[in-house]
């Protein structure tokens, strides 16, 4: 396995009117567990269903209804913890987080404050070749999602859809290790990539299946190092939380605005108030939502309806044995086995389906050539037409067939691109299509020699120029390929032209 080592990036420095400042960011990612049923009921989790059609008596808090833990959701949380190199707690417990909101029918949320199912882990976030930030994970806990309030159906009424109520969430809490807006977006992207590889969350931010709460503070240069020495959070400044971010771009914009807002307050001699804020993408600014609550504000206490959750190490080991190859390991293997560059390996492993496609194309073939075709031709065409790898009309076997025809010398690179275009629009077997369209490269040296002789005989002045300047021999190569309808093998033409001209 290729050994990949990284250097930590420098923190983002923002110049204020009076001083330089550094950013400190911690994140809480709410990832919806990929499961057909909710955390404590058997109701469906299908997105987009008719309002209030996926609701059980447990979800809407009918009297006497008791929650029953969904074992699959627990397994998904364990799998996620293992994927983040985290400690799996064999004993965890559920607590009630008490607050009132119209779309929370119980009047409390079942969560895990005191004894989460997953402890400390880490995520390596690559920012550039050889540059990466190691972000520590503090904990992962399971909790229920709330419902959805709808305010735009009637000017005088609000409606509630309980379909999402009780859906399992994993809250993934990071340490304040992120040091800039770009790092924050890269962290979310890397975490989403890992979750998708694991199959524990689909990472669909548009549907709200992955949401981020972003904690932002600013401090003077050198203060972060004091925090690292003492673990005293006061060195990091007063943080504000930006809630429910569901876009990488908005995350970066919100952090940048919030940092400058806090800097302006501090440089004017004021104090930053710890609070929860919302980002308004239309105005490009954050606004106050409410004062930031502490744990005691929610009156947490152990849920009396749920026993402590005890799992066996053997069960954890079974899950560990079924773990897929994760992005970092796959990237290192692609670089080692197929000789692709760091950049290409990142592109090829960004999505699990894309990595599988590439590997099918590259297996037994030139890895660099396969990467070039997959990234430039296939991905380029998919991006242009707004398609995903699952929608591609050119399957891996077909693209592999094109590369085989190139390798055997039957078609040239230009012919291969024309063949790819035909396969994209019409489909078919590459070898059969190439044969039917007469897309066969001329490799017969006798035929090529005849064409070269004719071109040389017709252009004596050009011959003298080429003998004086060998670089001009390329003109003859182009003329021969043109004369053969683009079918002559360029390498063979080059060799014969050089021989005939005595170069």
Swiss-Prot record:
Q: Name one GO molecular function term.
A: ATP binding
Q: What is its EC number?
A: 6.3.5.-
Known partners and oligomeric status: Heterotrimer of A, B and C subunits.
Spell out the family assignment given in the record's similarity comment: Belongs to the GatB/GatE family. GatB subfamily.
Q: Which reaction does it catalyse?
A: L-glutamyl-tRNA(Gln) + L-glutamine + ATP + H2O = L-glutaminyl-tRNA(Gln) + L-glutamate + ADP + phosphate + H(+); L-aspartyl-tRNA(Asn) + L-glutamine + ATP + H2O = L-asparaginyl-tRNA(Asn) + L-glutamate + ADP + phosphate + 2 H(+)
Protein task = Allows the formation of correctly charged Asn-tRNA(Asn) or Gln-tRNA(Gln) through the transamidation of misacylated Asp-tRNA(Asn) or Glu-tRNA(Gln) in organisms which lack either or both of asparaginyl-tRNA or glutaminyl-tRNA synthetases. The reaction takes place in the presence of glutamine and ATP through an activated phospho-Asp-tRNA(Asn) or phospho-Glu-tRNA(Gln).
* Presence of keyword Protein biosynthesis: yes
What is its EC class? ligase
Q: What is this protein called?
A: Aspartyl/glutamyl-tRNA(Asn/Gln) amidotransferase subunit B
Residues annotated as transmembrane: none
One GO term of the biological process aspect: glutaminyl-tRNAGln biosynthesis via transamidation
Gene encoding it? gatB
PANTHER family from the UniProt entry: GLUTAMYL-TRNA GLN AMIDOTRANSFERASE SUBUNIT B MITOCHONDRIAL AND PROKARYOTIC PET112-RELATED, GLUTAMYL-TRNA(GLN) AMIDOTRANSFERASE SUBUNIT B, MITOCHONDRIAL
What organism does the UniProt record list as the source? Answer: Cereibacter sphaeroides (strain ATCC 17023 / DSM 158 / JCM 6121 / CCUG 31486 / LMG 2827 / NBRC 12203 / NCIMB 8253 / ATH 2.4.1.)
Supply the alphabetized keyword list: ATP-binding, Ligase, Nucleotide-binding, Protein biosynthesis
């Amino acid at each position: 396995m290729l050994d990949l080592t990284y250097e930590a990036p420098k923190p983002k420095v923002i110049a204020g009117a009076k001083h330089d400042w550094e950013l400190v960011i911690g994140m809480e990612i709410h990832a919806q567990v990929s499961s057909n049923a909710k955390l404590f009921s058997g109701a469906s989790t299908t997105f987009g269903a008719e309002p209030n059609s996926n609701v059980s008596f447990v979800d809407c808090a009918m009297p006497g209804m008791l929650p029953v833990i969904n074992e699959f959701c627990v397994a998904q949380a364990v799998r996620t913890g293992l994927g983040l190199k985290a400690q799996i707690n064999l004993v965890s417990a559920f607590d009630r987080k008490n607050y009132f909101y119209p779309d929370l029918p119980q009047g409390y949320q079942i969560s895990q404050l005191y004894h989460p199912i997953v402890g400390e882990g880490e995520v390596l976030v690559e920012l550039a070749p050889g540059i990466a930030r190691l972000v520590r994970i503090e904990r992962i806990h399971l909790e229920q999602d709330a419902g959805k309030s709808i305010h735009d159906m009637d000017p005088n009424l609000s409606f509630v859809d309980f379909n999402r109520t009780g859906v399992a969430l994993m809250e993934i809490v990071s340490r304040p290790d992120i040091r800039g807006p770009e790092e924050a977006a890269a962290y979310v992207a890397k975490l989403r990539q890992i979750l998708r590889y694991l199959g524990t969350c689909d990472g669909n931010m548009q549907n709200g299946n992955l949401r981020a709460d972003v904690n932002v503070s600013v401090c003077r240069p050198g203060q972060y190092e004091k925090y690292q020495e003492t673990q005293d959070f006061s060195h990091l400044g007063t943080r504000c939380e930006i809630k429910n971010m569901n876009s990488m771009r908005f995350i970066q914009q919100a952090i940048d605005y919030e940092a400058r807002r806090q800097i302006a307050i501090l440089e004017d001699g004021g104090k930053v108030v710890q609070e929860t804020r919302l980002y308004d993408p239309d105005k490009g600014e954050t606004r106050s939502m409410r004062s930031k609550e502490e744990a005691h504000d929610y009156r947490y206490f152990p849920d009396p309806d749920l026993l402590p959750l005890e799992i066996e190490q053997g069960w954890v080991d079974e899950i560990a044995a079924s773990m897929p190859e994760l992005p970092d390991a796959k990237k290192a293997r692609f670089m080692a086995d197929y000789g692709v560059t760091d950049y290409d390996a990142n592109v090829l492993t960004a999505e699990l389906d894309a990595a599988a496609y590439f590997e099918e194309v590259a297996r037994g073939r030139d890895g660099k050539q396969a990467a070039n075709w997959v990234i430039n031709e296939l991905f380029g065409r998919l991006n242009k037409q707004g398609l995903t790898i699952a929608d591609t009309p050119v399957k891996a076997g077909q693209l592999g067939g094109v590369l085989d025809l190139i390798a055997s010398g039957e078609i040239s690179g230009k012919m291969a691109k024309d063949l790819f275009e035909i396969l994209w629009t019409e489909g078919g077997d590459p070898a059969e299509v190439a044969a039917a369209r007469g897309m066969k490269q001329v490799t017969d040296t006798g035929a090529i020699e005849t064409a070269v002789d004719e071109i040389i005989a017709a252009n004596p002045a050009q011959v003298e120029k080429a003998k004086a300047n060998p670089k001009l021999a390329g003109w003859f190569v182009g003329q021969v390929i043109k004369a053969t309808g683009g079918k002559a093998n360029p390498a063979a033409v080059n060799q014969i032209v050089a021989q005939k001209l005595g170069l």
